[in-house]
Amino acid sequence: MEAQNKLQIFNKYFDLIFIKFPIAFPIIYGVALYTLPGYENVIIFIALLTLAEPHFGATWPFFLDKGNFAEIKNRKIRYIYMPIAIILLSLIGFFYANSFFLLFFFAINMFHVTRQSYGICKLYKSNEQELNYQEKIIYFFNAVFFIVGILRFYIPIIDQTSIFKLNIIMLFSLFFTFLLYYFKFKNLENFLTLITGSIIFFPICFVDKPIHGIVMGVLMHYTQYLALTYKVYDKRNYNNLSKQVNNAKFFGIKNSTFLIIVL
């Protein structure tokens, strides 16, 4: 067995709770729905307000950072025109082709979330063989959950009588896949990262409304994104501050010290 990767984004425990295995968030969401069914919309709103919207807004510092202005200016099609076109097409699709738009949105959302899950695995990878296994497992199960979502809510072929059998099959499939993976690589933390990436859309198999299938598991995606974005933002601020300190030096002496000597 190869040595396990010791990379840490923040520290061992923060990484585990918010990036590698943020399972607490969908559990809290599910328990809240079960114990407070009359407040379903409030629970959805709170989840979206506290995690989803900050996750969407976390992208904006990219456009506000002066260091990125040249990149944005040189690639206007990617960073300006395409987002505007997507917004307009989304508005048109939502009002005039709602069913197709929702299906397309579901597919893009799953692809985006799956890509991030694989990216998280790359951050903590121990070796290429393990990463290849993680990629195949994550993409496979998320593709299965996408098909289940279509067959449950878009083309309702899977009815309530089949839900129990479906979940038994999925649970056994996940269990044996994870078991084989763990015995092969024996890396507990990467094993938990794999579980996170593989089960994000598992709620689509048992929730009664598609919104819960999207929000419940994807809360883990939101926390991962926010944690990583904060780290990038914090590192960027640190680098900018270091540059300012270096620029504030005069013949190797900080300006403040120089002024004190002069006075």
Task: Specify the residue positions occupied by each region the protein language model found.
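Short, hydrophobic transmembrane alpha-helix segments
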Residues: 30-44
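N-terminal membrane topogenic signal
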Residues: 3-23
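Membrane-interface helix-loop-helix junctions at boundaries between adjacent transmembrane segments
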Residues: 72, 89-164
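Long, contiguous internal "core" modules enriched in hydrophobic/ aromatic residues
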Residues: 128-207, 231
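C-terminal transmembrane-bundle signature of multipass membrane proteins
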Residues: 199-243, 250-263
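Hydrophobic core segments of alpha-helical transmembrane domains in multi-pass membrane proteins
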Residues: 43-54, 101-111, 165-173, 212-224
